[in-house]
Amino acid sequence: MQEKILVTGGAGFIGTHTVIELIQAGHQVVVVDNLVNSNRKSLEVVERITGVEVPFYEVDIRDTDTLRDIFKQEEPTGVIHFAGLKAVGESTRIPLAYYDNNIAGTVSLLKAMEENNCKNIIFSSSATVYGDPQTVPILEDFPLSVTNPYGRTKLMLEEILTDIYKADSEWNVVLLRYFNPIGAHESGDLGENPNGIPNNLLPYVTQVAVGKLEQVQVFGDDYDTEDGTGVRDYIHVVDLAKGHVAALKKIQKGSGLNVYNLGTGKGYSVLEIIQNMEKAVGRPIPYRIVDRRPGDIASCYSDPAKAKAELGWEAELDITQMCEDAWRWQSKHPNGFED
């Protein structure tokens, strides 16, 4: 059955890749994005790759009145909610902006959904809700705690969505806790395109490799890990996007409230990522060790077994593919979508 899905933040990195997978799975898609950390041209690439025109509304989801009108006009059956600010370090400097964007924006979205009787939502949560885990790999039933305002917004939103479901069992909610999405579309024409200096490791590394930035800053080499640098579970953005399509199948069956980790189950350190990117690029990538960032933790990787058992989903693309695809995108488009 073809569903119409409204995707907030659908012009962003994960959003665009998910829109492609949704269209290829036979769904209609409507995108809402304020373009604060994304680019309208990314959706033109999506349309070129899929051959399908994607209705787009340049709207901030805090604008509830406009959202209501969009829901009335488009009548989506479900929402995949990506929109929000997403940088750990930045969130410690400007927490109020994170609470305003992420919390107020989502409450506004949920009001518009409820008023239009659209009660199916897949929420883009994060592994940051686990805080600094006692052990790894991380299971969905681990205790939740957060070490920074970004993570706190994700945890608060999980709680808000849980409360809504408890109050009204007509809601179907899937909380997807992502680990660290990297890579790019295999075409090399769609990838991570941050506005300004990247906050995330991979686009920073690729921008150094392409000569836009001088060297990679490695935040701390004194963590309790094999080489002293932070370990994360990096997942190919296309695998992550496919996880949303799998979650949508689950939600269509009147599933209630469900939580899944979306990761590979394997951790790589910052230095290992740089080494893998050097192989993809074919030359050394300069880096220097600097102080730790506030809010960062030593090691974080998933146990994705629940998603495999219940959604029939697992990550398929390895770290080599992630780095090669990220480099193909960056080398073809050194200035992102402006090229």
Protein language model regions, located:
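Short, electropositive, low-hydrophobicity segments enriched in small/polar residues
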Residues: 13-19, 42, 88, 109, ...
